[in-house]
Swiss-Prot record:
It is found in: Cytoplasm. Belongs to the diaminopimelate epimerase family. HAMAP family: DAP_epimerase. Catalyzes the stereoinversion of LL-2,6-diaminopimelate (L,L-DAP) to meso-diaminopimelate (meso-DAP), a precursor of L-lysine and an essential component of the bacterial peptidoglycan. The lineage of its organism: Bacteria, Pseudomonadati, Pseudomonadota, Alphaproteobacteria, Caulobacterales. It is an enzyme of class 5 (isomerase). The gene is dapF. Substrate binds at N13, Q52, N72, G82, N83, N167, N201, E219, R220, G229, T230. The active site is at C81 (proton donor), C228 (proton acceptor). This is Diaminopimelate epimerase. GO terms for molecular function: diaminopimelate epimerase activity. GO terms for biological process: lysine biosynthetic process via diaminopimelate. NCBIfam families: DapF (TIGR00652). The keyword Isomerase applies. The record marks H169, E219 as: Could be important to modulate the pK values of the two catalytic cysteine residues. It comes from Caulobacter sp. (strain K31).
Length: 289
C-alpha cells in the first residue's frame, strides 16, 4: 500500500513527514536510509532525500495531539529535532484549526503556538545540564569540558560546553565563523569521541554580539545541515551559562535565523522560527513500511 508523505523544511533543514494516525509505520534502519538518501541524477538512484524522517503517531497520553518519532538519515531513531518540531507543530495546528498544540516525544512533551504566517514558537522544555544527562562517559563540569582538537599547545578548538536538548550537543566557541570544511572535518571527528557514548551533535558558535550567535552544526547521524533547531537551543544555553549572551538571542545560520530564549522563570528553552512546506508525495512501495 502506498503512503503519502509531506516534504517540509525549517531554514533548509529538511524532513520527510509521515502521518501514521491511520496506518502504522514501523520502518527498519535500512528503510529510513532509503527514504533519506538524496536523489542522484547522474547515477539515477536515491530516495526522496532529507536530513530526518518524522512520523506523527496517534497520541499515547491525555492532553497530547500526537506522539512524534524522529530518525536521522543514518537510520537511527533520535529523541528530538528542533526544526522538525516546528514543522510538526504547524501541521497539527493546521489540521486541528488551533493556535496552539502539545505532543509527546521520547524526550518528553513539547508544545507549540503560532507566531505569524508560517512562523512557529515551540517550548523545547528544560535543557539537560548534568554530565550524565548529556550523557558523557565520565563526570565533568558541562559548562566547559576537558576536550580539545589539534595540538596540545595550540588547539584549534577546546573546552566546549555540553547541553542535552533531548539529544546530546557539544558547543565549541570560536573567534570567527568556521568553514564548512572545518565543520565537517572536526565535527565528524568529535561526533564519535569516546567521551560521548551515544555520539554527539557538534556546534561551532561565534558570538557576534550579546544577542547574536552565528552557528554551524555537524549533526549526529546526518552530517553538516543547513540549520539545527536543537543545536541553536544548545548554543544559546551554553553561551548564557558562560555569560556570553543575554537570555534572548538571534541564532543565525547561513540559511536564516532562529530566535532562542532560555527563559529564566522556569528554565524552559523557547524557539521561534519559520516553517516551509515543499511538496506532497508518495513513498515508494519498498519503503512504505
Amino acid at each position: 500500500m502506498s503512503r503519502t508523505f509531506l516534504k517540509m523544511n525549517g531554514l533548509g533543514n529538511d524532513f520527510v513527514v509521515i502521518e501514521t494516525l491511520t496506518q502504522p509505520f514501523h520502518p527498519t534502519a535500512e528503510e529510513i536510509r532509503a527514504i533519506a538518501k538524496r536523489p542522484n541524477a547522474k547515477e539515477g538512484e536515491g530516495g526522496i532525500g532529507c536530513d530526518q524522517v518524522i512520523a506523527i503517531d496517534p497520541p499515547r497520553a491525555e492532553g497530547a495531539s500526537a506522539y512524534v518519532r524522529f530518525w536521522n538519515s543514518d537510520g537511527e531513531e533520535t529523541g528530538a529535532c528542533g526544526n522538525g518540531t516546528r514543522c510538526v507543530a504547524w501541521l497539527l495546528m493546521q489540521s486541528g484549526q488551533k493556535d496552539s498544540v502539545a505532543f509527546d516525544t521520547v524526550a518528553g512533551r513539547l508544545s507549540g503556538k503560532m507566531a505569524g504566517d508560517k512562523l512557529v514558537t515551540v517550548d523545547m522544555g528544560q535543557p539537560g545540564l548534568a554530565w550524565n544527562q548529556i550523557p558523557l562517559a565520565e563526570e565533568m563540569d558541562t559548562v566547559g569540558i576537558e576536550l580539545q582538537v589539534g595540538p596540545i599547545d595550540a588547539p584549534l578548538v577546546h573546552t566546549p560546553g555540553c547541553v542535552s536538548m533531548g539529544n546530546p550537543h557539544v558547543v565549541f566557541f570560536v573567534d570567527a565563523p568556521v568553514s564548512d570544511a572545518f565543520a565537517r572535518g572536526t565535527g565528524s571527528l568529535v561526533e564519535h569521541h569516546p567521551l560521548f557514548p551515544e555520539g554527539v551533535n557538534v556546534g561551532f558558535a561565534h558570538i557576534a554580539a550579546r544577542d547574536h550567535i552565528k552557528l554551524k552544526v555537524w549533526e549526529r547521524g546526518a552530517g553538516l545541515t543547513a540549520a539545527c533547531g536543537t543545536g541553536a537551543c544548545a548554543a544559546q544555553v551554553a553561551a548564557v551559562r558562560r555569560g556570553l549572551t543575554d537570555r534572548v538571542a538571534k541564532v543565525e545560520f547561513e540559511s536564516g535565523a532562529l530566535t532562542i530564549e532560555w527563559r529564566e522563570a522556569d528554565g524552559h528553552v523557547i524557539m521561534t522560527g519559520p516553517v516551509t512546506m515543499e511538496f506532497v508525495g508518495k513513498l515508494p512501495e519498498k519503503v512504505a513500511a
